[in-house]
Amino acid sequence: MTDAQATVSQLWVYPVKSCAGVMVQEATLTDMGLLHDRCWMVVDAHGEMVSQRDVPQMALIQPNLRLSDVVLRAPGMLALHLALFQVQEPVKVQLWGQIMPAFDMGDVAAQWFSDFLGQTPQGKALGPLRLARFDPDHVRLSSTQWTGTVAAKNQFSDGYPYLVCSQASVEDLNARLATQGHGAVDLRRFRPNIVLSGIPAHDEDHVSRLSWQAEEGAVVLQPVKPCSRCPMPNVDPDTAAVNPLLSDVLQSYRQDRRLDGAISFGMNAIVTQGVSEEVEPLLRVGQVLNVTYQL
């Protein structure tokens, strides 16, 4: 039974993990997330992930997805063009303690990231950086603690293929900020893939399924885990300045018992119907989704 309806108001793809996102009008759903989402990841000399948590200036790297390449731009840098379907030698990379195969993207990309992200705001030298592309033959699964029997695949996301957030949740946060005399923030700080309008603030926390009819058939997304929040939302996506105010405000009302009191905002989601290696439907801004709430 459908309990309500919501409308897709925004779609976001993040080609390079921890860099800026691309707002799109339509996106292809794959069994590993939106097409091209978190395909690439910046790594240090040891192959470990580099992110805005330590290097907030990554927020200033702006991607542009085109038919055959992605173009990266950053202040003071020439544009870097990455072919969508070309890689170099295989490498091993590490993400949250998981070691996995990937492909190096070559010396030009490595030098570009090393030049722009040469050191942290604290002056700590990062050393040489490399850019890696996810190996699509590798199967990286979400935690079955939250997905149950569903084998949900990921690329370089933190752990789940989709992140869903309601527009009203951000508006509610901004209302709280305003009462304290602070300016508004936008949802880019929370890095969602699918933004919904038409449901109340944080109703995504209580949704059991989001469904709609694509041209290929019925599609079902299942929110499975609250998205726990590290300090990354404190990074201003326009300036890369860091201010802990946002975390302080979230701490006052978004401690989640399901996460032992950690801050949550938005829901990680998986596909349970209608998407496979053979079937990859489009999702468009303006699509109306059927919302079923948890009992």
Spans of features found by a protein language model:
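Metal-cofactor-dependent catalytic cores
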Residues: M1-L295
